[in-house]
């Protein structure tokens, strides 16, 4: 593929572990202070974390603030359709072992959120930043990242996002403008491989692809891709480095991975490390090996990065356990067919299941994606459909042959489920709203 492997140990430690920060000009400093004040006011008024409004104010006063705040830092941009927030937290845990960092832990992943994260840590020499895939090109041009992490590319928010192939093409053009950037990319996702193109510093990772519904045909030429196994499941749960490949007659093919998973260990040609991820499911093994490869690319020694990944158990409320009366809720997020494909390996039969679907702007108004989720695999457990689009979800569950109840209000839906363990899977705004309601409920009781 014309790429150069970056060694597991990353760049020379002396060059990487002591990044130098440039001093900001007085106008940028004033813009940052105005943004911080706006964020503080937002929090004081109970309007949220303030990261979006704070970044927006800073950018309104200085449209070059993102570039100026990033200058002199070792910046890692983490992007893709699914797994950004989790992988971002895993990389941040590893990078913290070598120095302070800026980190958009809340998941505010567009320009205003990125500016706010950088402004909150003005002296940090590192930045580990989640970026919405639609905004990756513009943010990469502004910050000139040391590392770009590309997890996967699938359909999401059909009314907001353009066609996946167009997103991949935009990313490919952006990466071509940054030839010195290390691109840590998922070799198992044909759309990602197409997006990386001929980037000269690619590190390929066998991170898995639980959903390939958007790439039955080649992203480049449109011909049918050939997979070496019938169920086209590759990566952590399958063929490791090279047993389960894909290719097209045009020449686009799965690159030979530089990192892969074998018997629960992260492997390179010269590295073998236990991959101790405390997040559930095969999908998080893939996120873990992506995080480890990325941390090494920014200069963290592999044997120092790997143990740090164990620190991550909850990610912005995801995977958290919440006790509510006699129920124990496990909070999970899935927002598109690819996310659900990975989630199915995490759900524990016959644990009762609450599925909550909204369709606001942040979720995407179009819920037709529900028909691509294999809900048929959720049989033999109590299921309740909830959320603002509970009726749409209920229709899909009926066609899947699942006995279920439809209860629009999530708290009322929980009351319809038995005591004990309950898995809760919600899309973005439904997940956020339920967390807030449960928090207010606990505060009122205690």
Describe the function of each predicted region:
Residues 1-51, 55, 71, 222, ...:
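ATP-dependent carboxylate-amine ligase
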Residues 10-12, 16-206, 211-216:
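Phosphate-binding loop of NTP-binding sites
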Residues 118, 164-165, 214-225, 416-423:
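Short, surface-exposed amphipathic charged segments that create phosphate/polyanion-binding patches used
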Residues 130, 151, 184, 287, ...:
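Residue-level signal for inorganic ion chemistry
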């Amino acid at each position: 593929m014309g790429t150069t492997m970056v060694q597991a140990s990353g760049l020379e430690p002396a060059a990487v572990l002591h990044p130098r920060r440039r001093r900001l000009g007085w106008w940028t400093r004033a813009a940052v202070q105005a943004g911080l004040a706006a964020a503080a006011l937002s929090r004081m008024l109970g309007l949220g974390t303030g990261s979006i409004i704070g970044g927006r104010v800073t950018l309104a006063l200085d449209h070059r603030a993102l570039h100026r705040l990033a200058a002199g830092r070792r910046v890692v941009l983490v992007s893709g359709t699914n797994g950004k927030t989790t992988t971002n937290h895993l990389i941040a845990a590893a990078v913290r072992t070598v120095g302070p960092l800026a980190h958009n832990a809340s998941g505010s992943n567009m320009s205003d959120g990125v500016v706010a994260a950088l402004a909150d840590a003005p002296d940090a020499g590192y930045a580990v930043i989640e970026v919405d895939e639609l905004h990756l090109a513009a943010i990469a041009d502004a910050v000139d990242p040391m590392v770009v992490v590309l997890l996967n590319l699938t359909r999401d928010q059909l009314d907001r996002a353009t066609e996946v192939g167009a997103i991949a093409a935009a990313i490919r053009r952006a990466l071509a403008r940054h030839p010195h950037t290390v691109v840590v990319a998922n070799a198992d996702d044909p759309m990602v491989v197409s997006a990386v193109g001929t980037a000269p510093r690619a590190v390929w990772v066998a991170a898995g692809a639980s959903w390939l519904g958007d790439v039955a045909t080649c992203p480049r030429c449109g011909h049918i891709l050939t997979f070496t196994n019938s169920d086209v499941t590759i990566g952590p749960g399958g063929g490791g480095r090279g047993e389960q490949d894909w290719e097209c007659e045009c020449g686009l093919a799965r690159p030979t991975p530089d990192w892969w998973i074998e018997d629960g260990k992260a492997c390179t040609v010269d590295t073998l490390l236990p991959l101790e991820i405390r997040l559930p499911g095969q999908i998080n093994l893939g996120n873990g090996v992506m995080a480890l490869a990325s941390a090494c690319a920014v200069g963290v020694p592999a044997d120092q990065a790997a143990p740090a990944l164990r620190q991550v158990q909850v990610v912005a409320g995801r995977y958290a356990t919440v006790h509510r009366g006699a129920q124990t809720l496990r909070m999970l997020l899935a927002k598109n067919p690819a996310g659900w494909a990975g989630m199915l390996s995490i759900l524990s039969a016959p644990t009762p299941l609450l599925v909550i679907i909204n369709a606001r702007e942040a979720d995407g108004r179009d819920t037709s994606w529900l028909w691509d989720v294999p809900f048929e695999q959720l049989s033999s457990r109590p299921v309740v459909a909830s959320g603002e689009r509970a009726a749409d979800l209920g229709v899909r569950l009926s066609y899947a042959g699942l006995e279920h109840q439809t209860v629009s209000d999530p708290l009322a839906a929980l009351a319809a489920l038995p005591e004990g363990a309950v898995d809760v899977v919600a899309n973005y705004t439904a997940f956020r709203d339920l967390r807030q309601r449960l928090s207010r409920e606990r505060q009122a009781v205690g």
